[in-house]
Amino acid sequence: MPTAITSCPPKLDFDRISAISASTGLPLVLHGGSGLSDHDFREAVSRGICKVNIFTDIDKAGKRGIEKGLAAGAGTMMGLIPYEIQEMKAVVREKLTLFGSVNRA
């Protein structure tokens, strides 16, 4: 299962994000966030990041959901899906709050 696990902690150049945002006036995208702290995400958003592409955390949540479903006795894929979705939704809700995206279009 492919996941973006980093071998060393990432370090965002926040001043560069600010400069790019100021010079382009365009919404900026952060592709990936594996290894970033909540502070890093909040700072990046405050400096001009408008969209964050995340997969690894959601993927891991899906795996946890499947594991919970198996532990609860769900024996079919259809039985596991609700567990997977529940865990993934929780991570998405958490990220939406972290990124300041709740109740925003």
What are these regions (language model features)?
Residues 8-13, 41-45:
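Short glycine/threonine-rich loop-to-helix capping motif typified by GTGT followed
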Residues 9-30:
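Alpha-helix-loop-beta-strand connector modules within alpha/beta enzyme cores
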Residues 15-19, 43, 90, 94:
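Alpha-helical scaffolding segments of alpha/beta enzyme cores, especially the outer helices
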Residues 19-23, 43, 47, 65, ...:
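Alpha-helical structural signal in soluble globular domains
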Residues 33-49:
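Catalytic cores of alpha/beta
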Residues 66-105:
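Extended, intrinsically disordered, low-complexity segments
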